[in-house]
Amino acid sequence: MRENRPVIALDFPTLEDVKAFLAKFPADEKLYVKIGMELYYAAGPEIIRYVKELGHSIFLDLKLHDIPNTVKSAMRVLSNLGVDMTNVHAAGGVEMMKAAREGLGDGPILIAVTQLTSTSEEQMRDFQNIQTTLQESVVHYAQKTAEAGLDGVVCSAHEVPKIKEATNQDFICLTPGIRPAGAAVGDQKRVMTPADAHQIGSDYIVVGRPITQAEDPVAAYHDIKAQWNDQ
């Protein structure tokens, strides 16, 4: 279930910033956007309502990670917002992920974070004390996510083939850390171009600063969209 639109990370601090950014796009251009912690904590459910009124699709990226009952209750609230996709941390465990699925219901796509794309293998081993390879850790989390009945995972594009092999071809792989060729990588450790992510089998890509901080965001979006669709 590949999405042909790049998901734009709306990494802005205020609703006003989002309004100014989205106003640059034609009214009939329906986007897929990611609303993360900073923006949601600043603007609350109002940001969801505003973006949905414009007709855009929303990935609400809050990465819930708590005891199963708390996550279930939180997901029940989020289910009423009308988001198209949201997520949890796979590290919360199978029971927590099952509770999240139950609370959210069957409508929105529910995925789990494996290892953040800012995490290196050295950091994983030193801080998390996980003594496998980074790829093995990600694939393990993906298998547990599938076992819990979720729709897919957030992962680096580099791990997509192994995840598909270990789960199934319909298991969603949403990949952040996407940068056009020559763009600054910022705080991402495991990056890939849109065209390479397409070739390797990613289902969704998330792109932030190369679009939101571009001199012409609309042109940057269309360029990345063309690369993503191998045009």
From Swiss-Prot:
Top-level taxonomic group: Bacteria
Residues annotated as binding substrate: 11, 34, 61-70, 117, 179, 188, 208-209
EC number, as in UniProt: 4.1.1.23
Recorded catalytic activity of this chain's protein: orotidine 5'-phosphate + H(+) = UMP + CO2
Gene Ontology biological-process entries: 'de novo' pyrimidine nucleobase biosynthetic process; 'de novo' UMP biosynthetic process
Cellular component terms per the entry's GO annotation: cytosol
Any Pfam family hit: OMPdecase
Family named by the database record: Belongs to the OMP decarboxylase family. Type 1 subfamily.
Function as written in the Swiss-Prot or TrEMBL entry: Catalyzes the decarboxylation of orotidine 5'-monophosphate (OMP) to uridine 5'-monophosphate (UMP).
Protein name (database record): Orotidine 5'-phosphate decarboxylase
Organism field: Streptococcus thermophilus (strain ATCC BAA-491 / LMD-9)
